[in-house]
């Protein structure tokens, strides 16, 4: 008998532990090399653990919901066993297969709308399945990729939940709760995911550790919009990506950070660490919550490079494919609440960074130019900063530098 250990993959230095989500194989079942055995969740990403070798899954050491650390053994595979040897074990439950009706009854609670894993959510969207049409077998009823594949391949399974079609509004609720089934004054206690718990912890840490102050300014977006409208078609044809506004905000931020290095610095104990590089975090929404992937060396990136990377981050965040490396580090962050219609906000600093820029919705507003009232597309900028190391002067002038660069994009080319 040759036994191979299945171990938790390497986690980043900032991730101490992970949670086992859902085993896709049972002891005694045959596995192929690189076949996904389980998904584990860290406070940053969901990782898929593949089988290191082909064989038979002989022992599961860690169960769903268990907390594990990097390199910890979670299962063992017998590489000398064959699929044929595993067949008797798989055949044993055959009598249960003759009674599918109870299984359908058990699946009914899933109509409450189990939380779909990122990989499952993509498959469900492609197959036109709602959460109420898929029975979640993961922890706390979570819908796994295997659940989504099974539901998509079974036409009968799609037709069964038809009575639940009268409750489409439940799909707008993020919690996996069927409130209609809980009485007149419903409540449901749902445990936080590891990512949500980590977000809560870091936000509280930021509020309690940093001396947060926010400065505001308004920017006339007409010059950027005119430039974009003039070149957007040629830009997309040349670079294969649409010219958005975030690349201009990133460039304007880097422009200001070069002028005011303290905004790009961080505190380490009693020291101020000045970073000679510009790694810009871009806040991105995902099915699991807000994540902040990093644009490395943003000062060396073109507008096209930035737009391509942000688009890539959006797809990866939606599919749960962002790597730990992409989510680690950063010297400054940008949060764009404008995509949701936000007019104004006070963003919270992402530790250990010392500042964050909040971008909002661009709206036509009356402004005074040369004594005349004119209509201009205006955007309110908000920069929160750690007042422990950044004085008001640097913060205000830094935000003004961003404003000036956006109102005269030629400054970005001339480095003025």
Curated annotation (Swiss-Prot):
Domain Lipoyl-binding intervals: 3-78
InterPro entries in the cross-refs: 2-oxoA_DH_lipoyl-BS, 2-oxoacid_dehydrogenase, 2-oxoacid_DH_actylTfrase, Biotin_lipoyl, CAT-like_dom_sf, E3-bd_dom_sf, PSBD, Single_hybrid_motif
GO biological process: L-lysine catabolic process to acetyl-CoA via saccharopine; tricarboxylic acid cycle
Transferase found in the keyword field: yes
PROSITE patterns per UniProt: BIOTINYL_LIPOYL, LIPOYL, PSBD
Keyword RNA-binding: no
Pathway: Amino-acid degradation; L-lysine degradation via saccharopine pathway; glutaryl-CoA from L-lysine: step 6/6
GO molecular function: dihydrolipoyllysine-residue succinyltransferase activity
Enzyme class: transferase
The EC number(s) this enzyme carries: 2.3.1.61
The protein, known as: Dihydrolipoyllysine-residue succinyltransferase component of 2-oxoglutarate dehydrogenase complex
The species this protein was found in: Cupriavidus necator (strain ATCC 17699 / DSM 428 / KCTC 22496 / NCIMB 10442 / H16 / Stanier 337) (Ralstonia eutropha)
């Amino acid at each position: 008998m040759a036994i191979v250990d299945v171990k938790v993959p390497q986690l980043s230095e900032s991730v101490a532990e992970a949670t086992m989500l859902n085993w896709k194989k049972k002891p005694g079942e045959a596995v192929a090399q690189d076949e996904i055995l389980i998904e584990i969740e860290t406070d940053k990403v969901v990782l898929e653990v593949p089988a290191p070798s082909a064989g038979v899954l002989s022992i599961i050491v860690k169960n769903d919901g268990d907390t594990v650390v990097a390199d910890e053994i979670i299962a063992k595979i017998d590489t000398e066993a064959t699929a044929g040897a595993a067949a008797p074990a798989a055949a044993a439950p055959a009598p249960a297969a003759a009674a599918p009706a109870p299984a359908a009854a058990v699946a009914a609670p899933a109509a409450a709308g189990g939380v779909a894993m990122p990989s499952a959510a993509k498959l469900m969207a492609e197959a036109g399945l709602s959460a109420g049409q898929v029975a979640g077998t993961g922890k706390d009823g979570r819908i796994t990729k295997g659940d989504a594949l099974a539901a998509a391949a079974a036409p009968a399974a799609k037709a069964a939940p038809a009575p639940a079609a009268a409750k489409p509004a439940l799909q707008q609720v993020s919690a996996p709760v069927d409130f209609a089934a809980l009485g007149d004054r419903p409540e449901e206690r749902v445990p936080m995911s590891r990512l949500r718990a980590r977000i809560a912890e870091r936000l509280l840490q930021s509020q309690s550790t940093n001396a947060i102050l926010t400065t505001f300014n308004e920017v006339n977006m007409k010059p950027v919009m005119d430039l974009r409208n003039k070149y957007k078609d040629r830009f997309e044809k040349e670079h294969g990506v649409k010219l958005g506004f975030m690349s201009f905000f990133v460039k304007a931020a880097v422009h200001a950070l070069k002028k005011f290095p303290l905004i790009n610095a961080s505190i380490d104990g009693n020291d101020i660490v000045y970073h000679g590089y510009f790694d810009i975090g871009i806040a991105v929404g995902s099915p699991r919550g807000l994540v902040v992937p990093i644009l490395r060396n943003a000062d060396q990136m073109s507008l096209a490079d930035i737009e391509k990377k942000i688009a890539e981050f959006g797809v990866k965040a939606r599919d749960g494919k962002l790597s730990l490396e992409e989510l680690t580090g950063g010297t400054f962050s940008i949060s764009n609440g404008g995509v949701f219609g936000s007019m104004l906000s006070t963003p919270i600093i992402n530790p250990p960074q010392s500042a964050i820029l909040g971008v909002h919705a661009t709206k036509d507003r009356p402004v005074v130019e040369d004594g005349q009232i004119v209509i201009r597309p205006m955007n309110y900028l908000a920069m929160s900063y750690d007042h422990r190391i950044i004085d008001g002067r640097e913060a205000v002038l830094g935000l003004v530098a961003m404003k000036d660069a956006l109102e005269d994009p030629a400054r970005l080319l001339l480095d003025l």
